[in-house]
């Protein structure tokens, strides 16, 4: 509501809370698909209205940034080149890190990925396109970013829910641009200069045969790659996924089914 201009205030909490709200929205839509509770429908409509109002015309939305801009008297919704003028919010980022996705710890791509998923599930459950339209705008913004950003900045992502998101958007809309983006995301991964085992980007994905690093980041990546394989049938991706799957279920999984958070320094052979 603050980002939408409904009320005034400051952003509170970690920068990935947008994504958590979109996951909540996806959950509400899933429940509504079963029980058709009109109160849930109204709840979703009210939430979506805020999302739509907070989203820029170019498709970008990240409430820490939007709120920071509003409080500084900057309205990037009206700027001709809003991607370059965006002011990074107060949570992370330095003075020289301006523009969308300048600091990956803002979790912007993570948030946008979950907006895509929420928009699709809401559309399936209700037949409405209000949130799906916002997701399309966000996906188009992401496509434009990856087509125009510097190579190093384009590789700058963690917790890559957008890998799954863009494939699901391709499935929902049939837009081939989204599938091309999903393939490109895998191609450029591991080419970043400061890649780490923790972020699964020290080496290209097609050279990875063991699970490594941060479990949340890893499982987002593996699920997204599986989606790309499902659409393209690329056998190399299946080889990587099969090997990683076997490594997890035989060596790095609790008896409860949980994937452990870290495995200490990853093997480098």
What are these regions (language model features)?
Residues 1-7, 43-60, 133-150, 181-198, ...:
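Long, well-ordered core segments of solenoidal/helical folds
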Residues 1-20, 45-89:
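Low-complexity, Ser/Thr/Pro/Gly-enriched N-terminal "stalk/linker" regions
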Residues 1-37, 99-104:
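Asp/Glu-centered strand-loop micro-motifs enriched in Gly/Pro and often flanked by an aromatic residue
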Residues 15-26, 39-42, 46, 106-114, ...:
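Aromatic- and histidine-enriched alpha-helix N-cap/loop-to-helix transition segments
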Residues 25-38, 113-128, 162-174, 220-235:
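Well-ordered alpha-helical scaffold segments within catalytic/enzyme domains
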Residues 95-97, 103-158, 164-168:
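A conserved hydrophobic secondary-structure block that centers on an alpha-helix together
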Residues 136-142, 153-204, 211-218:
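Hydrophobic, small-residue-rich alpha-helical packing segments that form membrane-like cores
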Residues 262-269:
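Conserved small/polar residues in nucleotide/adenosyl-binding loops
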């Amino acid at each position: 509501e603050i980002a939408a201009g409904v009320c005034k205030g400051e952003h509170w909490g970690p920068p990935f809370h947008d994504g958590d709200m979109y996951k909540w929205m996806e959950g509400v839509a899933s429940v509504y698909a079963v029980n058709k509770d009109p109160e849930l429908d109204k709840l979703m409509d009210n939430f979506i209205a805020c999302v739509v109002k907070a989203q820029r015309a170019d498709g970008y939305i990240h409430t820490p940034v939007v709120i920071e801009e509003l409080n500084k008297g900057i309205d990037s919704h009206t700027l001709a080149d809003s991607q370059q003028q965006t002011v990074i919010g107060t949570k992370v980022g330095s003075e020289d890190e301006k523009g969308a996705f300048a600091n990956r710890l803002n979790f912007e791509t993570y948030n946008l990925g979950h907006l895509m998923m929420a928009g699709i599930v809401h559309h399936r459950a209700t037949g409405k396109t209000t949130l799906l339209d916002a997701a399309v705008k966000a996906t188009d913004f992401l496509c434009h970013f990856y087509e125009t950003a510097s190579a190093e900045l384009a590789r700058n992502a963690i917790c890559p829910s957008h890998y799954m998101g863009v494939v699901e958007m391709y499935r929902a809309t049939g837009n081939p641009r989204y599938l091309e983006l999903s393939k490109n995301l895998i191609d450029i991964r591991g080419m970043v200069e400061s890649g780490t085992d923790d972020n699964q980007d020290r080496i290209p994905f097609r050279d990875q045969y063991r699970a490594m690093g941060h479990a949340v980041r890893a499982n987002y990546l593996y699920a997204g790659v599986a989606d790309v394989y499902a659409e393209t049938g690329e056998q190399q991706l299946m080889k990587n996924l099969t090997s990683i799957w076997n490594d997890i279920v035989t060596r790095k999984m609790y008896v409860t089914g949980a994937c452990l958070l870290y495995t200490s320094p990853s093997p480098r052979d």
